[in-house]
Amino acid sequence: LLNIKGKRSVDSIHKELGHIMWEHVGMGRTAEGLREGLEKMKALRKEFDTNLFVPGTAEGLNVELDKAIHLRDFILMGELVANDALSRNESCGGHFREEYQTEEGEAKRDDEHFFYVGCWEYQGNDDTAPVLLKENLEYEAIKVQTRNYKN
């Protein structure tokens, strides 16, 4: 990271990532917005890899280097969150896809296809798509039902 010698500060890239996440992967999500966000994050990752400037050295404490290391992880995590949201063709909990809502604007779940815990496995290469691992949910003590906020 210290050898890139670009022109962008860690903070400027971090701020841009936050804007992308807010605009495209925030509370109200759409497939189109998620795809656009993923493209922007991919471009931002390339910008990070080629145009980052981290002042200082690797000797001793270097706060900017520490922030850069974490920011690289944040970019990858943002991509994983967006990929997960794009793969879930439903609205459930904190995940609200605008395409999947009732006429009243309530979340529209699809338990038939998305009743599982998902974990995305990084493949060790940023250009290789992560693999979704699934573990089906099995409830014995409670009955699964749709939340109703009207009553």
Spans of model-derived segments:
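Glycine- and aromatic-enriched mobile tails/lids
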Residues: L1-N151
